[in-house]
């Protein structure tokens, strides 16, 4: 019997526990309340902080609670251009400027947004990674829906009552800088999850992986496996319809 391979270790098992030991907290928009639905509420950016394991910086924003004598501290994903001391306005009657949070219905077409809600009141789900943004494409007044273009290029229709922050997420160009050495990759993934380094199966011993062993690094058998293969053997090209290079193309017909 071989060892438990990597695919089995990372697969289904006990309840997943996220790696959040040094994280600063969950970055979300304010809870949707009467103040935001009817008018606006003002906050002030107290600090811009780094969150380990996250590419984008976070903004610590203080709001005065509209219902009781208390200061509410919120963690927002910081857009490009936000600074400490800046006033942030959240609500239907907020102005269109970087860092403000508004419903999509109040934004003109072509507005660049980030931290967009997928469902009304979920406090931000889309376009949250460093340098990412979504674009408001069109509003439908009859159905109260808005069409947005996501960072992937896909178009999505969401309710016009969904909120979003105006601007581009800060930290753009982060992946342009090469990692260059293993030490930096080690520290990068140490705060994220146990996903590095990735050792190839052919570089292992036969007890550790189905592709391991041999006097030189080769798989030694067909790398295609069927869909119902047992967990420890299910590596390689799983339930592949075809393998190999795709040769030729549509314009290759000889009888032109």
Curated annotation (Swiss-Prot):
SUPFAM superfamilies, sorted: Nucleic acid-binding proteins (SSF50249), Translation proteins SH3-like domain (SSF50104)
Keyword Cytoplasm recorded: yes
Biological-process GO terms, alphabetical: cytoplasmic translation
Subcellular location: Cytoplasm
Annotated stretches, region: Disordered: 208-230
Keywords attached to this entry: Cytoplasm, Ribonucleoprotein, Ribosomal protein, RNA-binding, rRNA-binding
GO molecular function: RNA binding; rRNA binding; structural constituent of ribosome
SMART domains documented for this protein: Ribosomal_L2, Ribosomal_L2_C
Tissues where this protein is expressed: In larvae tissues examined: gut, brain imaginal disk, salivary glands, fat body, muscles, epidermis and trachaea.
PROSITE patterns according to UniProt: RIBOSOMAL_L2
Family: Belongs to the universal ribosomal protein uL2 family.
Protein's name according to its UniProt entry: Large ribosomal subunit protein uL2
Gene name of the record: RpL8
């Amino acid at each position: 019997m071989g060892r438990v391979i990597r695919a089995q270790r990372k697969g289904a098992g006990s309840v997943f526990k996220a790696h959040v030991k040094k994280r600063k907290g969950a970055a979300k928009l304010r809870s949707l309340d009467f103040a935001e639905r009817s008018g606006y509420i003002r906050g002030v950016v107290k600090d811009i902080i780094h969150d380990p394991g996250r590419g984008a910086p976070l903004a610590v924003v203080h709001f005065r609670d509209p219902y009781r004598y208390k200061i509410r501290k919120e963690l927002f994903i910081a857009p490009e251009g936000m600074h400490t001391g800046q006033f942030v306005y959240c609500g239907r009657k907020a102005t269109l400027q970087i860092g403000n949070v508004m419903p999509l219905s109040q934004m003109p077409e072509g507005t660049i947004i980030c931290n967009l809600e997928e469902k009304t009141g979920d406090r931000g789900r889309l376009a949250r990674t460093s340098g990412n943004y979504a674009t408001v494409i069109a509003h439908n007044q009859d159905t109260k829906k808005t069409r947005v273009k996501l960072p992937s290029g896909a178009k999505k229709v969401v309710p016009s009552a969904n909120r979003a922050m105006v601007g581009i997420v800060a930290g753009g160009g982060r992946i342009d800088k090469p990692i260059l050495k293993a030490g930096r990759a080690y520290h990068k993934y140490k705060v994220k999850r146990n996903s590095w380094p990735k050792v190839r199966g052919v570089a292992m011993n036969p007890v550790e992986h189905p592709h391991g062993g041999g006097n030189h690094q080769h798989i030694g058998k067909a790398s295609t496996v069927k869909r119902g293969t047992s967990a420890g053997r299910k590596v390689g090209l799983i339930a592949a319809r075809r393998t190999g290079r795709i040769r030729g193309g549509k314009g290759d017909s000889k009888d032109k």
